[in-house]
Amino acid sequence: MEQNSRALIDGFNRKIDYLRMSVTDRCDFRCVYCMAEDMQFLPRQQILSLEELFQVAERFVALGTRKIRLTGGEPLVRQGIVDLCGRIAALPGLRELCMTSNGSQLPRLAQPLFDAGLSRLNISLDSLDAERFKQLTRTGDLAQVIAGIDAARRAGFQRIKLNCVVLKGRNDDELVDLVRFAIDRELDITFIEEMPLGVISEHERGESFCSSDEVRARLAEQFTLIESTESSQGPARYWRLAEASSTRVGFISPHSHNFCATCNRVRLTVEGRLLLCLGNEHSMDLKQVLRAHPGDAERLEKAIRDSLHLKPYRHHFEVGGDVQILRFMNMTGG
């Protein structure tokens, strides 16, 4: 009863029980849809310390959060990330600690992360062609990422999920091959419509947009898709494959089928801004609270609760429209 009475409820009666925490804005890739090629990263004093990140996680779990996802940038380039995972995973009441990674550091870190208590991994994979993969990531090594995926499987992670951002004319001819790759390794895969965050020069977003409906129609030419009621507590909607019971295909559709009505999420940027919506700038500065009142759990809890009235009902992303959010995805928490 005490947990219910302390639950985080926004102004539209949505229960907030999922926190996405960015632990760094830095990354060893420069993906074309995520950041500028010459990205300027934040100085260390501007980002939350590992202890500050833990304090926020601890307070959210005390307020009923049951799922935390660690993001970046690339979370595995943050020194001390394995220890942070261990501390957060041990919080009483937390059901799931997940991470989204580009996979490059998993050959050496998959086993330590699993041993520390990380529950699940999402791994970005936008192409199976080495040259194309390098073009999309600007610096990435496909073989290294595949080695990371295999290391995660050996470490014991279950329900590993691949994330693919679909860009028309750049990787949309690989949809079937990516699903077959997932089937071969008994992985889930989610296809994502590009998020319109930050001004990019690599491609015109309106021209590169590929809707989830189009992706699903193309896959249906090769596979039998069975709609599922399963949920990962996030925005993805899943289909089962008649041809492969161990693989689910998901779709995240911020443009064509937005998931705002049931949104249960907030995001913490590495600067300590609590973002109430991916597509809005409404935020609460938790870093200011953490540093002005170190160790004061009550003040931190009050700031979190006070922020909920800022959460809007929905975002207003438009395909091909003007960029409304200037922060890049790596600054938001991917």
From Swiss-Prot:
The keyword Metal-binding applies. One of its GO terms (biological process) is Mo-molybdopterin cofactor biosynthetic process. InterPro entries: Aldolase_TIM, Elp3/MiaA/NifB-like_rSAM, MoaA, MoaA_NifB_PqqE_Fe-S-bd_CS, MoaA_twitch, MoCo_biosynth_MoaA/MoaC, rSAM. Gene3D superfamilies: Aldolase class I (3.20.20.70). Binds 2 [4Fe-4S] clusters. Binds 1 [4Fe-4S] cluster coordinated with 3 cysteines and an exchangeable S-adenosyl-L-methionine and 1 [4Fe-4S] cluster coordinated with 3 cysteines and the GTP-derived substrate. The keyword Oxidoreductase does not apply. Belongs to the radical SAM superfamily. MoaA family. Pathway: Cofactor biosynthesis; molybdopterin biosynthesis. CDD domains: Radical_SAM, Twitch_MoaA. It catalyses: GTP + AH2 + S-adenosyl-L-methionine = (8S)-3',8-cyclo-7,8-dihydroguanosine 5'-triphosphate + 5'-deoxyadenosine + L-methionine + A + H(+). Catalyzes the cyclization of GTP to (8S)-3',8-cyclo-7,8-dihydroguanosine 5'-triphosphate. S-adenosyl-L-methionine binds at Y33, G73, S124, M195. SMART domains: Elp3. Its cofactor is [4Fe-4S] cluster. [4Fe-4S] cluster 1 binds at C27, C31, C34. This is GTP 3',8-cyclase. The gene is moaA.
